[in-house]
Amino acid sequence: IMIWNPNKECMSREEMRALQGKRLQKLVNYVYHNVPFYRNKMQAMDISPEDIRSIDDIVKLPFTTKQDLRDNYPYGLQAAPPSEIVRVHASSGTTGNPTIVGYTRKDLSVWSEVMARCLTAFGVTRDDTFSVAYGYGLFTGGLGAHYGVENLGATVIPTSTGNTEKHIRLIRDLKISGIACTPSYALYLAETLDKMGLSKEDIGLRIGAFGAEPWTDNMRKEIEERLGLKGYNIYGLSEIMGPGVSYECQEQNGSHINEDHFYPEIINPETLEQLPYGTQGELVFTTLTKEGMPVLRYRTKDLCTLYDEPCACGRTSVKMGRIMGRSDDMLIIRGINVFPSQVESVILTMPEFEPQYMLVVDRKNNLDTLQVQVEVRRDFFSDDLGRMLAMKKALADKLKSVLSISADVKLMEPNSIERSQGKSKHVIDNRKLV
């Protein structure tokens, strides 16, 4: 079994906890003195860095939320001075301000280290040629995977997203053996392959590193069957680092967390209490070694379970199960974060519509689709088809500019969308993700 960094990935649990404790002490001291936001929060809770003596003391520390990052836009949570920041990324969220994350040179070297661990676990070697088909740019996927492939010593082809037929010809002609992309793009690649009259044997892909959106085992089987490769899950988020926070090994029963850099906890999202291993709750991460924008106990809003049983692959790190949902109402559609509240705010700007709407998310031919059903106000409802189509197009255009993905708008008659008592339900997610 190939392991990139056995010293860290196979460390005994006692040694790992001791290392995490040391790193946490150093981190708390660092943010206390460099980030006023954390110093104020800790002072309000009457905690000083001296109170943190081991990793168990993490429960004394404050949580960080997405809203905290937004409120401190752009650089309010940055701990390193601007002269130390060598790169900036931003989250793929579309509401309000994006989350701006600065990286120091050391952060980038940690990132390419954890990515090399992931790729090695998938079976990538120096002899592979690897296509990175995540978006390059502010999104962390492209460059995150790119430098991991380079660090490992394989050949990287920075394909990015875009011309899929050209991409397939490159895979065939350059004998590309691995690909990093979203699972939905992998299926789109398979469809394009069929359209071009080529078979999986013509391209010879061996390994797929798939992430940036939740996907099911059925989807994995289909991708593997149609592209002739073995697909592995990779998890990450820009607020913590980007791809490379956790990864599957050959056993594929959960994803190993790079917990010498990212300390995981599971909490009850209602009471905020830490939960034991084996219990489902909200995933929380602390960046133990980050310099640019470290975070304490960041609430990911992803629901999953942590496991600490030893793995047959020899790695000793804690594993996370599949993401089973969200503790907020965020939807991930084609890799983009979408909140029902965004749709609502667009509808509220248009007097033709009642603020009664329903989002129907589906997966057709393995691509996510979003339909927005909205009620037309009685005084705007008419038999004039041209007028109704113009209203429909106006809403679709507005939604596209706000959400960054296109939605199919369906105009509904007044009072046709069911009203609910209490918490109104605005989402029907027909994708069988669980």
Regions found by a protein language model. Give the residues of each.
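Conserved AMP-binding/adenylate-forming
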Residues: R206, W215-P310
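AMP-binding/adenylate-forming catalytic core of the ANL superfamily
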Residues: I179, T289-I405, G422
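Conserved helix-loop-beta element of the AMP-binding
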Residues: T129, M196-W215
